[in-house]
Amino acid sequence: LQVVSPLKALQRLAERHREAFDIPVVGITGSNGKTVVKEWLYQLLSPEKNVTRSPRSYNSQIGVPLSVWNLEERSEVGLFEAGISEPGEMEALQSVIQPTIGVFTCLGDAHQENFTSYEQKCMEKLKLFKDAKVLVYDMDDARVAGCVNRSAFKGEYFAWSRQRRDVPLYIASVEKREAETVVSYIYKGKEAACSIPFIDEASLANSVSCLAVCLHLGMSPETIAARMAVLEPVAMRLEVKEGRSGCTLINDSYNSDYNSLDIALDFMNRRPDCAGRKRTLILSDIEQAGGAPEDLYGRVARLVAMRGVEKFIGVGPCLSAVQGLFGMEACFYRSTDELLGSGVLDTLHDEVILIKGARSFRFDVLTEHLALKVHETTLEVNLNAVVDNLNYYRSFMKSETKMVC
C-alpha cells in the first residue's frame, strides 16, 4: 500500500485503532513531568487494572501512534503522554489519543523558542483536551488557569490548589520530613492524607496530579495512601554498565511488562557492542498482566526468540511452570535468591545481558552481583618531598629567575 505521507498514514491507522476502545484514557501533557506522572499512575492503577501506557517517553508524532497501537482487548485503562515542540502539532496527537481524562502537569521553558509567548504554548498544549471529559490542572499557576478558561475544553474542571478551598481538590497542608512528604487534602468535603517518599517540589506536584486522577477514577483514599507511600522513582532510560568477565549489563529492573520488554530487547540489539556476542536475558515473572499465563508467556517466548536471545534465565514461579515454551538455552529459578545461590551468574562470560524484572523480585541485587566492581584508590602526597624537589630544580636556575605556580 503506497501512501503520500507515511506519518499521516500511521497516525490515521492508530486513530482508528483507538476508536475501538471505550475505556478511560488519560492524556498527559505539559513542559515537564509527563513521563513521571504516567509511570506513577501506572504504579498506582496496575495492581487492579490492566493498564496500557506509552513506553518510556514515546510522546512525539511517531511515538504517540506507536503507543496507542499497543491497546488490546484486555486493556482497561490507557495512559499516554503527548509532547510538542512547535505550533500545529497537537491536533494530530489529540486525534490519536482521544483522551477522556486530561492531565496538564506544568508550564515551563521547554521549546519556548518556537512560540511567541508562554500563553501560545499553553493554548497549543490544551488542544489535547478539547473533547476530554475531565481536566486535571494546577489552579495556582495563573497562566495555566487563565489559558484553561479560554480554551475549547467543555468538560469537568478538576483543579487542585494549595491556596483556594473552592476547588475540587484542596491541598490543606504539606509537611516535608527527612525522607517523605505528607500531603493532607480535602476532596468532596472529606479530609484525608497520603505520603510520598520524595521531598522535592516537582515530585509533590506530580503526585498531586496522580492523586486527582485516582480520586476521579473512584480509588479509595486508603488505597491511594498505601500505594503512594511506596512509589518508586522513575528510571528515564535504560542503564548500561560494564559487567564482570567481559560482559555488558543493560539494567531495566524497574518494571516488567510485555511492551517494555520488547523495547528493551530492541535497545539491546541496536547496541554496537552486541555484534558477535551472546545475547542473554534475565527475566522475572510479569506481574499484574491478567489473562492466562500460557498465552502471556507464549507471546514472551516468541518475542524472545524473534529478538535473537540465545540464553534465557527465568525467575519466578510462573516462568518456572511454563519453561517448556522456551526453546533456546534456558534455565529457571523460582526466586531471585535461588538464582543467586545457583552459581549460574558466575558462568556468564563476554555476553550482553539484559536484566528485566518486576520490582518485587529485587533484580537490583543481580545487577550489583554482575557489575564490575570499582575499587577506591587513595593518593597520598608528601608535601615535604614536593618542596625538596622544587628547591632542587631551583638550584639550577639563575637568581633573577622568577617562578609562577
Residue spans for each PLM region:
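Acidic, Mg2+-coordinating active-site environments of NTP-dependent enzymes
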Residues: L1, I101-T248, R270, G276-R277, ...
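Phosphate-binding loop of NTP-binding sites
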Residues: Q2, L7-M139, A145-E156, D346, ...
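ATP-dependent carboxylate/acyl-activation modules
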Residues: I28, A235-E239, L261, L265, ...
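Short glycine-rich anion-binding loops that position phosphate/pyrophosphate groups of nucleotides
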Residues: I84-P87, G108-A110, D141-A142, N255-S256, ...
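Glycine/threonine-rich flexible loop motifs
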Residues: Q112-S117, L261, G290-E294, D364-V365
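C-terminal helical cap/extension that packs against the catalytic core
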Residues: S253, K278-E351
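A charged N-terminal "starter" segment
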Residues: E351-V352, R362-C405
